[in-house]
């Protein structure tokens, strides 16, 4: 994974648990006229101290031809594939290995830059690499080409549910016997003038904490006023269970539930009654054959918006009933911001780590919880050790698209 806390799973996870925030002022462009000036950028550097060094993953000439969401996606995929030991499948193994990596927005910075260039200097100045360097499916395409993965080559585009949908859909392809191995997840890098302006004009971003960026993302807190844009990528390798066991693969968890729903309500606002979120979670539980009381930890969508946080919390309480008092729920967006199309995949990885290590990551800045938070452990301010055998991870997106994943501890 690549996140605003750094490059790699260990770096990001250790910093999440220690309560660090990836939020800061915008550095990519002059944001002095921007209403919202707080974002969570990937820390770029020479690779030391967890900084992201793109040269570790791509040749400079190749990197210049693509937008950063593709760079982040390739980097996260390389980490995942190397960790899984699946770097060079051959023959039928290659034909039964696929890719499903999506993005909510894709190459928006490059589109913006090329549009300005064309209008200022004419169409002949547009790069021949412009189209393949911005298309959302080109993360999957690049990874497929790089590792010779000849199975399903697909991309998901469902706004902020993209990463979760990609993992869930890829798991279903394996269940349907279309593949034995799928590289799946999401990548995003849309922090650019038009991207920030668009979300800000939609009144979606935090503006109250421009002078104290680390305080801006505060799910369920009474002082929340919008989400903080983030960027990065989260990629996992999914594998048919017997196939994984046969080759002695390291198994982090087992995907047992996947639920989807549509709000059919509004292009940006969630349905006020939370019914879409409720039905996605219920469908995931049904698919898993589990009761609400079987879930120990929920990684909430929890974006820090006044409306969305409240609605998700209500849906969780409605579905889980009395069992809600026994679980822990937190939002890692309080640390890394909202990674949009990459969020669901990154959060699924964090959830698996929480399960492996029996520790729930914290919800930062939850200093004054909303009254509706009573009766549920939202892991305020500090990580919490507790038994975690099964997790549920929520992702909800513009257009009313909802996804819930359930992953449980793997046992023989």
Language model region names:
Residues 2, 21-25, 35, 210-288, ...:
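Condensing-enzyme catalytic core mediating Claisen C-C bond formation in acyl metabolism
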Residues 31-45, 108-110, 189-217, 259-279, ...:
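Active-site-adjacent elements of ketosynthase-type condensing enzymes
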